């Protein structure tokens, strides 16, 4: 049979060759996938979401729920108008040439439109902007000290009805009734500095009381965002199949992706996607073999955490299935050594804890294996983690590194989840004036009465740690960090101590002193399928694989190796999900003309 005949047969495959047909098949139920499905539906196409896990929400449900959208409608409503050309220049600078101008322009131009579409599409899609959480490089041209992180209000999960049980729960469950609105957390960290911090503590107690008395099941941040998106899907009758992993992409003889095989109830289901398939299935967060292959420095993390432990905060179901499926049909991949890095503490039970506000508190510094500071401790977490990786490659142990502080800081600031208030029996977090014995027994936290003794316990040169402490204290007393400029950026100041002239600098006082071990954690991988400005997946020669789109952590990030501001993972995921759906709709219209 001639190739022309083969193509004719392939082109005229009847619906009988498939078990199910849709215009747009979306693989993955996180923020990017749900946005793609809603945008497809809004463009007059029928969409289906298939989700590998028994739970929906993906890494978005586990996240802080912020969405980085410069020029968002909520900013405009507040009278804050951003120069989008400046935002493009900001992104171009921080991505350092790794990302095409076309992709950057697409993000900057389409992100506000995406958010406007969602707000108009459903009563559940409500977004708010509260200024103050600066971009991560606010001093750069186009950066913003007021920030562009957009959030959703809290929601009572009871409105989900039976679907509540299908929402992916946070990795660390808070006590019933405890939830933080975006600005609550910052004030909570100031519980010993001002009455606003104490007011948040009282608010949390009241929320616990309400939950027990009235049955409230309130959720905020990522949980609220994904609950709202699920409600919007229901409002528009967009179906979603849970426990339905995509196992294979289907192509025609020209290499166009025309559908996928999905396993459902133990059976393979062939689904035809008339317009296209959108891969929004997340990264390969928990495929440690694959990750170690691309970043050998993670072997050191595994040595510290334990070979059987996993240091990613990403969706437990993220194993790279969508990326591999794309590769099998010819897709190129980029940035597989990258992740949304986050310095963290790893407790003996394998539980990871963010190191965020601790790195911004004033009386502390971080040292490497030589006992020296190596970065502005308050730097954005991607920068801090890259410094750890680069130091390790250079032969200086920075995985782990150690945060050095004093007992006064422990009594004054939230450190390692410890709340600096009098001992509260049966409290859900550590309280009281003593460093928990379990911390000291774990080996993750070291205690000593002098810097020299502490140095011995963490394996750094005693004389050098003393010299580093003396140098830091001298700079802190003068009010400026001449070595690393800690405290110069509005971003540094966010979780600092607002009662100090420099919120991020204060000399360490008397002992005992403490060292907290820091390793590499992450919020998920950020490398994957190579895509263009229309979210189309590309081959190695940058030609387009027709019918295949991707967004979110399944792609090589539009942020490159950087991080523009809080929400710079979810913002692009949702935006390029929207872009993909709009492009499919446009292509479908062209075909029918």
Where are these regions (language model features)?
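Internal hydrophobic alpha-helix adjacent to the cofactor/substrate pocket in enzyme cavities
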Residues: 325-332, 466, 572-591
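Extreme N-terminal leader/targeting segments of oxidoreductases
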Residues: 1-24, 42, 227, 559-562, ...
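N-terminal Rossmann-like FAD-binding beta1-loop-alpha1 element of flavoenzymes
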Residues: 24-49
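A glycine-rich dinucleotide-binding beta-alpha-beta segment and adjacent secondary-structure elements
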Residues: 248, 256, 464-558, 562
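Conserved N-terminal/central alpha/beta ligand/cofactor-binding core
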Residues: 2-6, 11, 52-239, 291-295, ...
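An anion/pyrophosphate-binding glycine-rich loop and adjacent beta-alpha core
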Residues: 146, 153-199, 323-325, 329-460, ...
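Helical element adjacent to the flavin cofactor pocket in flavoenzyme catalytic cores
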Residues: 206-275, 323
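Glycine-rich loop(s) and the adjacent beta-strand/alpha-helix scaffold that form part
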Residues: 216-223, 235, 264-347, 570, ...
């Amino acid at each position: 049979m001639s190739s022309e005949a083969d193509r004719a047969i392939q082109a005229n495959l009847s619906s009988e060759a498939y078990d199910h047909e849709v215009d747009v098949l979306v693989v993955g139920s996180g923020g990017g996938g749900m946005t793609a499905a809603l945008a497809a539906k809004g463009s007059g196409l029928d969409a289906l979401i298939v989700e590998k896990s028994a739970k929906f929400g993906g890494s978005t449900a586990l996240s802080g729920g912020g969405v980085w959208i410069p020029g968002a409608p909520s900013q405009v409503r507040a009278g804050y108008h951003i120069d989008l050309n400046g935002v493009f220049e900001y992104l171009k600078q921080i991505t350092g040439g790794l990302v095409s101008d076309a992709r950057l322009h697409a993000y900057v131009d389409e992100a506000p439109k995406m958010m406007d579409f969602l707000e108009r599409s459903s009563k559940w899609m409500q977004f708010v902007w509260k200024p103050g959480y600066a971009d991560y490089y606010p001093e750069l041209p186009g950066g913003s000290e007021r920030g562009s992180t957009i959030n959703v209000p809290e929601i009572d999960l009871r409105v989900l009805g039976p679907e509540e049980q299908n929402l992916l729960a946070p990795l660390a469950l808070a006590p019933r009734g405890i939830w933080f609105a975006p600005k609550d957390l910052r004030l909570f960290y100031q519980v010993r500095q001002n009455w606003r911090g104490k007011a948040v503590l009282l608010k949390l107690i009241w929320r616990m009381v309400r939950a027990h008395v009235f049955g409230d099941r309130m959720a905020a941040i990522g949980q609220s965002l994904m609950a709202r998106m699920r409600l919007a899907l229901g409002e528009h009758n967009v179906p979603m199949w849970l426990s339905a992993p995509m196992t294979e992409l289907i192509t025609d003889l020209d290499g166009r992706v025309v559908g996928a095989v999905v396993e459902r109830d133990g059976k393979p289901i062939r689904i035809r996607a008339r317009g296209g398939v959108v891969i929004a299935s997340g990264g390969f967060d928990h495929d440690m073999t694959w990750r170690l292959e691309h970043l050998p420095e993670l072997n050191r993390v595994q040595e510290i955490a334990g070979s059987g432990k996993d240091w990613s905060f990403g969706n437990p179901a993220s194993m790279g299935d969508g990326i591999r499926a794309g590769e099998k049909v010819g897709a190129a991949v980029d940035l597989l050594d990258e992740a949304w890095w986050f310095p963290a503490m790893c407790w003996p039970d394998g539980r990871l804890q963010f190191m965020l506000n601790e790195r911004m508190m004033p009386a502390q510094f971080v040292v490497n294996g030589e006992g020296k500071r190596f970065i502005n401790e308050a730097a954005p977490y991607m920068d801090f983690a890259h410094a750890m990786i680069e130091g390790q490659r250079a032969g200086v142990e920075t995985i782990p590194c150690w945060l050095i502080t004093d007992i006064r800081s422990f009594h004054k600031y939230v450190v390692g989840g410890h709340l600096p208030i009098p001992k509260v029996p049966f409290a859900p977090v550590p309280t009281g004036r003593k460093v928990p014995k379990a911390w000291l027994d774990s080996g993750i936290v070291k205690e000593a009465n002098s810097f020299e003794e502490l140095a011995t316990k963490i394996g750094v040169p005693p004389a050098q740690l003393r010299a580093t402490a003396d140098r830091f204290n001298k700079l802190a007393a003068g009010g400026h960090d001449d070595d690393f400029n800690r405290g110069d950026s509005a971003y540094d100041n966010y979780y600092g101590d607002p009662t100090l002239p420099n919120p991020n600098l204060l000399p360490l006082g008397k002992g005992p002193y403490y060292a907290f071990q820091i390793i590499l954690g992450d919020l998920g991988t950020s490398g994957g399928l190579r895509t263009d400005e229309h979210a189309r997946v590309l081959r190695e020669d940058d030609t387009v694989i027709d019918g295949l789109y991707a967004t979110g952590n399944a792609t090589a990030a539009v942020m490159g190796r950087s991080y523009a501001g809080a929400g710079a993972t979810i913002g692009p995921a949702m935006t390029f999900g929207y872009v993909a759906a709009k492009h499919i709709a446009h292509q479908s219209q062209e075909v029918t003309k």
